[in-house]
UniProtKB/Swiss-Prot annotation:
NCBIfam families: ATP_synt_b (TIGR01144)
Subunit (UniProt): F-type ATPases have 2 components, F(1) - the catalytic core - and F(0) - the membrane proton channel. F(1) has five subunits: alpha(3), beta(3), gamma(1), delta(1), epsilon(1). F(0) has three main subunits: a(1), b(2) and c(10-14). The alpha and beta chains form an alternating ring which encloses part of the gamma chain. F(1) is attached to F(0) by a central stalk formed by the gamma and epsilon chains, while a peripheral stalk is formed by the delta and b chains.
GO CC list: plasma membrane; proton-transporting ATP synthase complex
Listed name of the protein: ATP synthase subunit b
Lineage, highest ranks first: Bacteria, Bacillati, Bacillota, Bacilli, Lactobacillales
């Protein structure tokens, strides 16, 4: 046997097997296309649609999160401004209240001083009136005694001293 005959015979066997393999492969492909390709293709399409939907949903959620973050940032900034305004108003109110309290206290103190001065002036006036009355009474009493009896200078001095001692008691 020569190499050509071996090659020809072996080539012929391989060609027959190759045709058979091709035929089986073609039948297998037709069966796959008919029974499996549709469901696999549908499954791949559903998967593609789900991925697209998930990406769209993620983008939407990200936009919502950004919007919410911006709203919260704005609310935080607004609340800080409100807190600053409240503190400012509280300080202003406290200063105004303090001024009002001091003014009221000054008015009360002035009224108390005025009343005390008036009372002191009245007490002084009353004391002076009482002293005048006593001096007048003493003068009248001395005059009565002097008139009732003619006294010497020594007797007059003793009489005045007795009246002064009587005032001390």
């Amino acid at each position: 046997m020569t190499i050509q005959t071996l090659f020809a015979a072996s080539h012929h066997i391989y060609l027959g097997n190759a045709i058979w393999y091709l035929l089986c492969f073609a039948i297998l492909m037709l069966l796959i296309k008919h029974y499996a390709w549709g469901p696999v293709s549908d499954m791949m399409e559903k998967r593609r649609q789900k991925i697209i939907s998930d990406l769209d949903s993620a983008a939407s959620d990200r936009k919502k999160a950004e919007t919410l973050a911006n709203e919260r940032e704005a609310a935080l900034k607004n609340s800080r401004q409100e807190a600053t305004q409240i503190l400012s108003d509280a300080k202003t109110n406290a200063q105004n209240t303090s001024k009002e309290i001091v003014a009221s206290a000054n008015e009360d103190a002035a009224a108390i001083r005025k009343k005390a001065n008036e009372e002191a002036a009245k007490a002084k006036s009353d004391a002076l009136d009482a002293a005048r009355d006593q001096v007048a009474d003493i003068s009248v009493a001395i005059a009565e005694k002097v008139i009732a009896k003619n006294l010497s200078a020594e007797d007059q001095k003793d009489l005045v001293d007795q009246f002064i001692k009587g005032l001390d008691d």
